[in-house]
Amino acid sequence: MKQNLRIVYIVLLFCGTFIPAATGLSAMDISGYESNVNIAVAAERSTEFSKISDKTGKAPFFLIFDGSGAFVKAIKNPAQYQQGGASSSVTALLKKESVKTLIAVEFGAKMENNLKAAGIEYLEHSGTAKEVVESIFKK
């Protein structure tokens, strides 16, 4: 068992040091942090200049931004007209999209509980999606 653990450790050490150096990739590229999309904004429209929605679970769109704050895509909210369980559906969608933080004007208790359980941070902001995301990255 100890021998197997040593082999795993050596392989992980090799992958973490040699491969990035040989390929010119940084550790951030290997981990995927910067390349993974990780910020979503509940929005009224599908553009990055859209107003942030005050209806988190029923927002018409979720705008996805990457780890550097660049706009990636807009996703139509499949739960926009859902009668019940919108917060669960939205949380599942955000997890599928590798979202780490959700921004909206306000969050209801059910949405907060679902996001916490999924490990998704949530921030309350108003304004346009692009302005708010840029302000977060300036901090």
Where are these regions (language model features)?
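Short acidic, glycine/proline-enriched helix-loop-strand junctions
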Residues: F62-I64, E97, K110-V132
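Non-catalytic interface/targeting segments
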Residues: K2-Q82, H125-K139
